[in-house]
Swiss-Prot record:
Active site: 172 (proton acceptor)
Catalytic activity annotation: (S)-lactate + NAD(+) = pyruvate + NADH + H(+)
The protein's name: L-lactate dehydrogenase
Localisation: Cytoplasm
Pathway: Fermentation; pyruvate fermentation to lactate; (S)-lactate from pyruvate: step 1/1
Activity modulation notes: Allosterically activated by fructose 1,6-bisphosphate (FBP).
Species of origin: Pseudothermotoga lettingae (strain ATCC BAA-301 / DSM 14385 / NBRC 107922 / TMO) (Thermotoga lettingae)
HAMAP family for this protein: Lactate_dehydrog
Binding residue positions for NAD(+): 11, 32, 37, 76-77, 115-117, 140
CDD domains, A to Z: LDH_2
Top-level enzyme category: oxidoreductase
Keywords tagged on the record: Allosteric enzyme, Cytoplasm, NAD, Oxidoreductase, Phosphoprotein
Source organism phylogeny: Bacteria, Thermotogati, Thermotogota, Thermotogae, Thermotogales
Length: 312
């Protein structure tokens, strides 16, 4: 199985490293405009293969992604401290368009996973430019936001994160929302569970959600980038699709003519179906507002591209 990754930065290499530990890839190609860095990262990664399954890892050019089973995109300008993900739009849309053309040319049958931010906007651009079936173009969406919230709740409540079931949907960013009406711990409403919690130092659930929303900003401020958790999450996505596990993930998927974070069942061909999550009236309104935020930035990205084209 062949995986190609655009971007040899911290996120791209964290994904590659996590993928090595899944032991599913026979071949891996790392593509970056800084070929020297890509070669150095590949050499470092290759030295770990004696401890894992053998994998042919190379630093390459776009044509080296030929006939990939998966193409993962992490390339683009990175998010600065305090910067909104959506403010990255104009800088990254052009890069994604160039990559889309290369994927379409060399790996037209690949499943494409976009990690670059703003992930919802860029996943839409990627789908539109490749003209692939939307089921095979997936953004990481709110997969990490959902995981962060589950981890925070699990730590506070003294349970396994795997026993916390809650979805964060919408934009991977400031307008995302938590589906409180469906959030449970061990099948019990999360708010009901907390009524019987013996932890006397509990942080209010709403505050945990705010911590989740601000987690990336905090990590960027302290260490410069988020890379380890998203590396693990992306590798888990690839593995679950490759193994046809039919797992539910909150990923950025196509609906209502945009890409947005929503629970979906993923199988060997990509998105199999969206989970019919029932939202209450407040959640529906918040979800619609999040859609409008994404639509706004899609329009801005398209506008900037038209202006650039007309000036050339």
């Amino acid at each position: 199985m062949k995986v190609s990754i655009f971007g040899a930065g911290r996120v791209g290499i964290s994904i590659a490293y996590s993928l090595l530990h899944t032991k599913i890839a026979d071949e891996m190609v790392i593509v970056d405009i800084d070929i020297k860095r890509a070669e150095g990262e590949v050499l470092d990664l290759y030295h770990s293969t004696p401890f894992l399954k053998r994998c042919n890892i190379t630093a390459g050019n776009p044509h080296d992604i030929l006939n990939s089973d998966f193409v993962i995109i992490t390339a683009g300008a990175s998010q600065s401290a305090g910067e909104s993900r959506l403010s990255l739009t104009k800088r990254n849309v052009k890069i994604i368009r160039q990559i889309a053309a290369q994927i379409k040319k060399y790996s037209p049958d690949a499943i494409v996973i976009n990690v670059s931010n703003p992930v919802d906007v860029l996943s839409y651009v990627l789908w539109k430019e490749t003209k692939f079936n939307w089921r095979k173009v997936i953004g990481t969406g709110t997969i990490l936001d959902t995981a962060r919230f589950r981890a925070l709740v699990a730590k506070q409540c003294g349970v396994s994160p795997m026993s916390v079931h809650a979805y964060i949907i919408g934009e991977h960013g400031d307008s995302e929302l938590l589906v409180w009406s469906n959030a449970t711990i061990g099948g019990v409403s999360i708010k009901r569970f907390c009524q019987f919690c013996t932890n006397k130092n509990c942080t209010p659930l709403e505050s945990l959600f705010e911590q989740t929303k601000n987690a990336a900003y905090e990590i960027i401020e302290k260490k410069g980038a988020t890379n380890l958790a998203i590396g693990t999450a992306t590798a888990a996505l690839v593995e679950s699709i490759y193994r046809d596990e039919k797992r539910v993930w909150t990923v950025s998927v196509f609906q209502d003519n945009l890409y947005i974070g929503f629970p979906a069942i993923l199988g060997k061909n990509g998105v199999e179906k969206l989970v019919p999550v029932k939202l209450n009236s407040v959640e529906k309104e918040a979800f619609e507002r999040s859609k409008e935020v994404i639509k706004k930035y899609i329009k801005e990205g398209e506008k900037s591209e038209r202006e650039e084209s007309s000036s050339n």
